[in-house]
Amino acid sequence: MSNSNIDNDPAKIDSLLRKAKSKKIPVTYDDINKALPLNKNPSIRQLEEAILKFSDAGVDILESNEDDEIKLDIGIDEEFKLSTNVDNESEDEVEEENIGSTDDPVRLYLKDMGGVDLLTRENEVEIAKRIEEGRKTMTASLCRSPVAMRCFIVWYEDLVNEKMLLRDLIDLEANMLHDEVHENDEEHNSETEVEEHEDNHLSMSRVETQILHNIIDRMKKISFICEELLIEAKKCYEESFDPKVLQNSRKYNNNLELLIHEVSEIHFNSKRTEEILGKMYGINRDLINKETAFLKLAEKYGVTRQNFLDEYIGSVINAAWKEKMLKNKKVAWKELITKESDYIDQMINELSVIESNTGLLVNDFKKLVNTIQKSERQTLQAKKDMIEANLRLVISIAKKYANRGLQFLDLIQEGNIGLMKAVDKFEYRRGYKFSTYATWWIRQAITRAIADQARTIRIPVHMIETINKILRTSRQMLNELGYEPTATEIANRLSMPLDKVRKVMKIAKEPISLENPVGDDSDGGQLGDFIEDKNAVAPIDAAIQSNLREVTTRVLATLTPREERVLRMRFGIGMNTDHTLEEVGQQFKVTRERIRQIESKALRKLQHPIRSKKLNSFRNGGKRGDGNPSDLLEA
């Protein structure tokens, strides 16, 4: 039988077949069905062909997956068979489903994650060395750039003049937590961590104060070295314009090595590094645009792309180069230089400005940028490898914090952010396994996210610390006393004012949604249905008002139309507002006195017992002497 239909998606079928044969386990019809193309409804013929393929290979096919343990492992370690359901699904249900395709983002994430092998200690060290090598190359390259040197000088001046905060210059967190990670894989109390993690946050300003003078001294030294290097580089280029002279200068090289060492000792904020890279990449883009435009112009005159690159790349584009190209044997070059002389002169001037701004020849600057970009790619790839291999660790930690106010996927996301920070700050020479080191960072990121985002109404960090202290004491006293302690007992235990304890306990209450269902059945309604709306009109008041309108209309109907109209306008009955005698008189084209007379006559008629009896029940705000509202409805 032809397998042409299966060939539409052979990878999944073959992968399933290989795993079943290698592990000598049967597959189910569901496994085969899931391995068929997802974007098409598999036909009976396709399914039959797939079944035949497995039968020919000697793989048993079951009706259903009766044995939960017969699964095709996709590489997720037994230690990390994790829950993907916040509603406390069993861990066995969360293991990846038999290679089958799915459009569930969580399962796709777990599937991709499971396809990456775990790292050994040697693998971690190897990746860490790649990251370190990439950073060293980038640091050395940046320190060779006068653009970076000028930035270092400006940063030092801003720091001294208090125009820049220390936390905006360096990575305070890296300095603060430099010695806080210990080789300790024991279980942590996640609840206690959420309560106490903010102590580190509160000490950030203290750390900033402690290391400020040390950083200023180091930046002062860096600034001085940069000034020396810039002066020597400027002198060299003005005299000889030969980069080899500078490269062979012992003084310059000694200062450069010293600068690289000093800069490497400072954990600069990522924004500061991006600032330097942004400037250099911007200049490089400008250069590429100019060179591209020059290439297109040369091609119009018949200069081939390869010939252009041979003559342009590696050459110093100046007046001497222009004269040299005029003597070129190729006619196309001579024609280009002759007819586009002004354009080339302008380009030479622009390149000269760039060389002046960067402090390097164009070719040297391009090589430097290329080295930086290469080291950046190397570092990013190494970080990516380390992160992807440790995603299981994030999930294993995140599941311990489920039902703490954040969705499980949000916990994973925050944990991944902590994992990325751990990769940035991992120091393999300390001898820790990366998982031990990363666990602290992942927990820190998750607990901070819970404290900041879990509550609908955000509470300040210092208040969260007080709340957690009181709740912790309350639980301890509950275990000791056997009953819920009062606010007074908690205040005495903590030596805290009673008013403050009551205030904190009130703040600690979680908000409740008005849409929470009441009762077990769907007809129980929502919590908001049982809360009184102070602004709403009570049903009895609405009925009285409606009855008053009807009675008033009937009573006014016993008057003449003119009298009814005058009373309605004067007292605003059935209108938006009342009217003055002058306004009513203008409507009827009579004097104010005549309107007053009509009004008086109409009011006397209403005072007649036959009419007034119907309205007396509504006097005194709608309450009769006996206070029975039903009398008003019967009026």
Swiss-Prot record:
Pfam short name (any one): Sigma70_r1_2
PROSITE patterns: SIGMA70_1, SIGMA70_2
InterPro entries, per the entry: RNA_pol_sigma-70_dom (IPR014284), RNA_pol_sigma70 (IPR000943), RNA_pol_sigma70_r1_2 (IPR009042), RNA_pol_sigma70_r2 (IPR007627), RNA_pol_sigma70_r3 (IPR007624), RNA_pol_sigma70_r4 (IPR007630), RNA_pol_sigma_70_non-ess (IPR007631), RNA_pol_sigma_70_r1_1 (IPR007127)
GO MF, one example: DNA binding
Chain segments carrying region Sigma-70 factor domain-3: 465-542
A Gene Ontology biological process term: DNA-templated transcription initiation
DNA-binding region residue numbers: 581-600
Motif Interaction with polymerase core subunit RpoC boundaries: 410-413
Subunit structure: Interacts transiently with the RNA polymerase catalytic core.
Function: Sigma factors are initiation factors that promote the attachment of RNA polymerase to specific initiation sites and are then released. This sigma factor is the primary sigma factor during exponential growth.
Listed PANTHER family: RNA POLYMERASE SIGMA FACTOR RPO, RNA POLYMERASE SIGMA FACTOR RPOD
Protein name: RNA polymerase sigma factor RpoD
